[in-house]
Design a protein with these regions (language model features):
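ATP-dependent adenylation/nucleotidyltransferase module used to activate substrates
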Residues: 1-290, 294, 322, 418-461
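Cys/His-clustered metal-coordination modules, chiefly Zn-binding fingers
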Residues: 359-431, 444
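Flexible helical/loop "lid" subdomain adjacent to adenine-nucleotide binding pockets
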Residues: 261, 270, 274, 280-317, ...
Length: 461
């Protein structure tokens, strides 16, 4: 109520509430003692030691849970120089060290594929990049192989053949292999795992490093052929698909040549989520389980594994920064390309932008879709469907393609022609039913008995 002569004072000016800041008393969520240096997710602040233990455990758990790599096996590490593959190489290097609690028991090797010719790099830039690559690979102490993408023009047609694959070992077989390996090491007087000794395998240097840029050499001709192949393709989407296919064929060939039965790739969870959405857009949904799962067994005797599939790009970047993991920057085929230049770039921008707003986007997309693809994976293994997809994008003309691709295409064309020619002479189930309908019932039963007897004795009728 208003009162006469009352003095109304102006409202007291108050300072705005302070902006909340991270408390200096905040501790690591793991040990509750150390000061946090990394925040992976909201509320998940780790100190340096706990973050390293968390990161290493993810890598070890992925290998131990699947148990596809047996002790003493030769494993080829596909290293591109990027953050994820460099982190994978560093994990293997530390896992084989003497001070590791549970040392890895396989024998590693490293392969680097020089894609400079396909990405439009100059000769000087390629030589400089190879020098940095050689310096890092020599520090690892592993046998290493440097090959150029141009070498796909010298691959044999057998690289596309799916070699016979031994049945996957059970858990009991894995335990027996571990016990046998440890017993063998005890007999030899070596405690721990086998690490590649110096001189065990000679370093394989491809022509890309020995005679790179020699005019008139076969490498110069192959480089020109590779450039002509990629220049004949008009869309960036087709170029990226072709590059991925040729790279995989080259790595599988090197693995077979040098006796590697497993190939490790450094694809992270973020990268696989982007690849998953990209393959759906490209109409390759039937092969998602092979393209994004832990293992890819479509090549038969060489199995591709992805031990970094539980690590996000954010975790990889933090780990490499905190622990000084070396890497080599090499421009990709889509470097500086606009967002809508290809389906790959569009899906990458979409997933990363969504991940910024909703931090659980990558894990949700990846894990939910993979759960629905598990039955599809089992069905493709039973019927061999995963081996049908060889090439996703072809150039307007087949002339620039590598010889082994042309040979395989010609062979498949001949198979289709032969199958069409003999189609009318093949006996189908419907023909047998019609034949049985025209003969006497007793004669039909005797024919079935003779046919069953022939199948039981291994004689085909």
């Amino acid at each position: 109520m208003c009162q006469a002569g009352e003095d109304y004072a102006e409202p007291v000016q108050r300072d705005p509430p302070p902006v909340p800041r991270p408390s200096r008393e905040q501790k690591c969520v793991k040990c509750a003692e150390g000061l946090p240096v990394v925040v992976i997710r909201a509320g998940d602040a780790f100190c340096r030691d706990c973050f390293k233990a968390f990161y290493v455990h993810k890598f070890r758990a992925m290998l131990g849970k699947n148990r596809l790599i047996f002790p003493g096996e030769k494993v080829l590490l596909a290293w591109s120089g990027g953050p994820s593959s460099s982190s994978m190489l560093w994990q293997v290097l530390e896992g084989l060290s003497q001070d590791s609690a549970k040392r890895l028991r396989f024998v590693p090797g490293v392969i680097y594929v020089d894609e400079g010719a396909a990405c439009g790099q100059s000769l000087e830039d390629r030589v400089k990049t190879l020098a940095e690559v050689k310096l890092i690979l020599q520090k690892t102490g592993f046998p290493w192989h440097v090959v150029a993408l141009e070498e796909v023009f010298g691959l044999p047609p057998s690289v596309l053949c799916c070699a016979s694959q031994e049945p996957a070992g059970t858990e009991e077989a894995y335990k027996v292999a571990v016990d046998s390996f440890l017993q063998q090491q005890h007999v030899l007087g070596v405690e721990g795992c086998v690490s590649p000794a110096e001189g065990e395998e000679q370093i394989h240097l491809s022509h890309s490093q020995e005679s790179l840029g020699t005019t008139g050499s076969p490498v110069a001709a192959q480089t020109e052929a590779l450039s002509r192949l990629f220049n004949s393709i008009k869309t960036l989407t087709a170029k990226e698909e072709l590059l991925q296919t040729l790279r995989t064929h080259l790595i599988v060939h090197v693995a077979r040549t040098h006796g590697y039965c497993k190939v490790m790739t450094g694809e992270s969870c973020t990268r696989l989520a982007i690849k998953l959405m990209t393959n759906l857009a490209l109409g390759r949904g039937a092969f998602l389980a092979w393209d994004t799962g832990f293992s890819d067994e479509r090549h038969g005797d060489v199995v591709l594994v992805r031990p970094m599939r539980d690590h996000t790009l954010k975790e990889v970047a933090f780990y490499n920064h905190l622990f000084g993991v070396p890497s080599v920057f090499t421009p990709a085929i889509d470097t500086k390309a606009p967002e809508k230049a290809s389906i790959h770039r569009l899906m990458e921008a979409f997933i990363l932008r969504l991940q910024t707003l909703f931090p659980s986007t990558v894990s949700t997309v990846y894990r939910c879709v993979l759960l629905s693809l598990l039955p599809m994976l089992e069905g493709s293994r039973a019927h061999g469907w995963g081996r049908l997809a060889t090439f996703a994008c072809l150039p307007p003309s087949v002339d620039p393609l590598p010889p082994y691709v042309l040979a395989e295409a010609q062979l498949r064309s001949q198979r289709a022609w032969v199958s069409q020619e003999i189609q009318e002479y093949l006996i189908t189930d419907s023909d047998e039913e019609e034949e049985e309908g025209r003969v006497e019932p007793g004669h039909a039963q005797s024919c079935k008995a003779v046919k069953q007897e022939g199948e039981d004795t291994g004689i085909g009728l």
